[in-house]
Amino acid sequence: NYKSVTSEDFIQMLVEKGCRYALYFHYMPVGNAASVDLLLNPEQRIYVKNRVREIRNMEHGPGIFTMDFQNDGEFVGGCIAGGRNYFHINANGDAEPCVFIHYSGANIRENTLLECLKQPLFMAYRDNQPFNNNQLRPCPMLENPEILQRIVKETGAKSTDLQSPETVEHLCAKCHEYADKWAPEADKLWNESTHMEHAYENYKPKEQKNC
């Protein structure tokens, strides 16, 4: 539905209903039964990237600010999860690095928020961010699945998916082909683009990283 939700008619409907901000999330193959057939191919992802930026054109756009969770990584310094800027707490109280990454080693019923933020998985996130210097490839799961698999294994984090508990190997195996196909296209786009001189990069200082 990537063309439907970026169409002129859909955007105009949002504006008419008073919407002034929209954040697009790409499909993530989370869960044992998740289909990889629903993942965008490189051509489709490039279309979404360009279309979302066209919609949010401040001079000629329709009056709604749109952002793309995957394609606008450069404006927030890549992945913001794992406590860098945000994390997710599921219905069971498990402190997860991201709403899409159901692994954890801490729970708010047993740990303070500070303890949750200092859990090994979150610290591994901070040690490895940014997960890719090309911020069109920001995610440790979708575009860099080898990293997520490694840090979950190294930290001993457990699956916290309440519907379909899934090993990190199974999850990441669904992302390798996508990552391999997107990488050359993303690198070409990144190398041909001009980037902000003073980007938002609140990373852990290199001298403090444990990697």
Please give the residue ranges for each predicted region.
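Active-site lining segments that contact anionic ligands and/or coordinate catalytic metals
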Residues: R84, N92, N134-L136
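Flexible mid-to-C-terminal extensions adjoining Fe-S/redox cofactors in radical SAM and related proteins
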Residues: F100-C211
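Radical SAM enzyme [4Fe-4S]-AdoMet core and its adjacent flexible, acidic
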Residues: N1-G78, G82, A91-E96, F100-N111
